[in-house]
Structure formats: C-alpha cells, structure tokens
Regions:
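Conserved small/polar residues in nucleotide/adenosyl-binding loops
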Residues: 185-192
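Glycine-rich phosphate/pyrophosphate-binding loop at beta-loop-alpha junctions
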Residues: 1-46, 118-134
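Alpha-helix initiation and N-capping motif
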Residues: 21-25, 36-39, 59, 73, ...
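Active-site-adjacent helical/loop segments in soluble small-molecule enzymes
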Residues: 34-112, 170-177
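Catalytic phosphate/nucleotide-handling subdomain of diverse soluble enzymes
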Residues: 100-164
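Short beta-alpha connecting loops at secondary-structure transitions
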Residues: 7-16, 62-65, 167-169
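Long, charge-rich low-complexity segments
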Residues: 159-184
Length: 196
C-alpha cells in the first residue's frame, strides 16, 4: 500500500506508463474512499515527502477490484507479435502491456472471469517497437518506420499521423531539465508583460 515517487524512473516503450505521479490514482482513491480530506492529505504527503501509505481499509477495496502484474518491453513486444499472429490485430505498446498482464491473470486465476483489454493508442505512435514486436527491424526515421509498418501489415496509417511529415514544426526549443525553473520564471514574466 505504499506509493513512492522517489523510486527509480525507467523509460520504456510505453511512455504513458512511465510516470512517477499518477493523477488517475488520485481520482481512484477518491472514488473508492469518498473522502476528499484523506486524498488531499495523501497528495500533500506525496508532494512534501515523496511518498504515502494507503490506509488498510482503502487498500482492501483496491485489492478487491484490481489484479496487478508486470510486463517489461520484451514482454510487450512478444505480446504485440502474438496478438498480430493469433488475431491479426496490430496493437500499440500500452495495449500490449495490458494484453500480457491479462494473459498472466488468466493463467493464475481459475475464476473464468471475462477479461476485456481496451486499446489505448495507435500502433503508429510507436512504430519501431511495434515493428520489432512482429519480427521486423525498423529502418529510417519515424516516418519511414510508419511506412514500413504499413507495408508489412497493410494496416492504414492514421491520417493525423500520416500528414505530420509535411507539416511545419511549431515547437523547436528544447529545454534541459536543469534549466526548467529558469524557463518557468522567464515564461511567467513574459506572460505578465503580455497582459499589461
């Protein structure tokens, strides 16, 4: 029942899962507890100490609703490959994690509950990892790899992604993490001047 944002941060092929502070968990804690004061206290502890402990009664509610497992990048790529071969469905890396953990659940639990896995993103947002999952090597830049994925699978590239190559890049600045407080101060000063 301990949530600790001080843990090591790992980058994976599923970047939406690479987080240290989960706002979805905050909402879930409120939905299950109905106690905004408790959730505010936990979030304050997280902000000030980097960690909090979920009370036993709330942890019991979480455990009654959820089953958890782990899936690394290799497992996700293997899931992408098996889903493609067995179901001819091209899934993204996040969905592959869900699929892999769903298979773990089915192996470890004889309750015969139905399992629903919802796709959360286009495989074309992660074309290199998806290509590797179906046994191909990615070649070229992200746009080349999207075309390669389409050529290998026949799955259409979404129009919003297919048109990106010819669009103008709007944001070119890269700010190093160490420079962020300075950049934030600069932006706030600029915003203030703009409204004067």
């Amino acid at each position: 029942g301990r949530y600790d944002r001080r843990r090591p941060f790992y980058k994976t092929a599923s970047p939406s899962m690479d987080i240290l502070v989960s706002s979805n968990l905050e909402r879930l804690l409120y939905l299950l507890s109905g106690d905004d004061a408790l959730v505010a206290q936990l979030m304050q502890q997280l902000n000030e100490e980097g960690t909090y402990e979920v009370p036993e009664d709330l942890l019991a509610k979480l455990r009654a609703l959820f089953w958890a497992g782990c899936c690394d990048d290799a497992g996700a790529k293997a899931a992408i490959g098996s889903v493609w071969r067995e179901h001819h469905y091209l899934c993204d890396t996040h969905t592959a994690v869900a699929w892999d953990v769903a298979q773990q659940y089915k192996k470890e639990n004889a309750d015969h509950n139905e399992v629903v896995v919802l796709s959360t993103a286009s495989p074309y947002k992660f074309p290199a990892a998806v290509l590797e999952g179906i046994g191909e090597s990615a070649k070229g830049d992200e746009f080349d790899v999207m075309e390669q994925l389409h050529d290998v699978t026949g799955v259409p590239v979404p129009k919003n992604l297919a048109g990106l190559r010819s669009r103008e890049v709007r944001h070119r600045d890269v700010i190093e993490q160490g420079d962020m407080p300075v950049s934030y101060t600069h932006l706030r000063a600029h915003e203030t001047r703009r409204h004067l």
